[in-house]
Amino acid sequence: MEFNQHITVLLNETIELLNIKPDGIYVDCTFGRGGHSQLILKKLSKKGKLICLDQDQEAINFANNLFKNNTNVIVIKTNFKNLKSALSAHKIFYVDGFIFDLGLSSPQLDDPKRGFSYHKNAWLDMRMDQSQNLNAHYIVNNYSFAKLVSIFKRYGEIKYPKIIADAIVKERSIKEINTTLELVEIIKKYSPKKNLFEKKHPARLFFQAIRIEVNDELNILEKAFNDAISMLNPLGVVAIISFHSLEDKIVKKVFNNYAKIKLPKEVPINNYVNKYSLLNQKIMPSTQELNDNNRSRSSILRGLIRNY
């Protein structure tokens, strides 16, 4: 894969789930490099509207350049935790479809200076919004042993968090840990030997945990999903692509809260239609997509529709 090339995951499946209305209003909450947005725009009439959100300035620059002559598109630099206020500022209060693609874009992963990858040497950064203060370098070099253990357990579901947390504290007391590959070497050096021979990289879950902490990823999901659902027009859809079990658990929890309401005994079931329904249990990449794009391997798509 070339540097900065990005292949959108579950592209056609997501657009099919949204069932685009030509005159509708659609929000791509995680623009990235605009794979979903560009396909939505092709299906919109001149009356339709597309709103693109991203907190990454490079993504915003890309979107502004891509859509500079298109009056159907509004580009907003913000975290999707600000979804409601960002849309209301543009007098948008109801929407026909939302997309959340929770994965990192390939340009973010492949750009060494962003510090997301455990395969490339870079300064420990991992900020999606590069204007914020907290970064991976601060976490690795300043968080206490107990706090490191906590984020490794909560955000990485790691079975031996104390071993690596202790190793980080020990190594940084000798020399500051500055780069991604320095951290990788510490993880490899102190990990149980059996973990070094697993298919997945031994640093993968530690990097995931630190990245989630840097960007406060999980804490903002539930609010953003609820905000999106509250703004749906009748027959509007929220489509969410998650990339690990922690994200998917939150998606399922929120969707089930709306779609699986327990009725009082006195309400006849035959006369009741829930306001919201699940569109699917889950959609996963086809064998062809997995072959074409290895980064799609852990993705899961779920959808919720407002019935009336």
Curated annotation (Swiss-Prot):
Superkingdom to which the source organism belongs: Bacteria
Catalytically driven reaction(s): cytidine(1402) in 16S rRNA + S-adenosyl-L-methionine = N(4)-methylcytidine(1402) in 16S rRNA + S-adenosyl-L-homocysteine + H(+)
One Gene Ontology cellular component annotation held by this UniProt entry: cytoplasm
Biological-process GO terms, alphabetical: rRNA base methylation
Major subcellular location class: cytoplasm
Location in or out of the cell: Cytoplasm
Top EC group: transferase
UniProt keyword list: Cytoplasm, Methyltransferase, rRNA processing, S-adenosyl-L-methionine, Transferase
Coiled coil: none
Disulfide links within the chain: none
A GO term, aspect molecular function: rRNA (cytosine-N4-)-methyltransferase activity
InterPro entries assigned to the protein according to its UniProt record, in alphabetical order: RsmH, SAM-dep_MeTrfase_MraW_recog, SAM-dependent_MTases_sf
HAMAP family: 16SrRNA_methyltr_H (MF_01007)
Record function comment: Specifically methylates the N4 position of cytidine in position 1402 (C1402) of 16S rRNA.
Family: Belongs to the methyltransferase superfamily. RsmH family.
Name of this chain's protein: Ribosomal RNA small subunit methyltransferase H
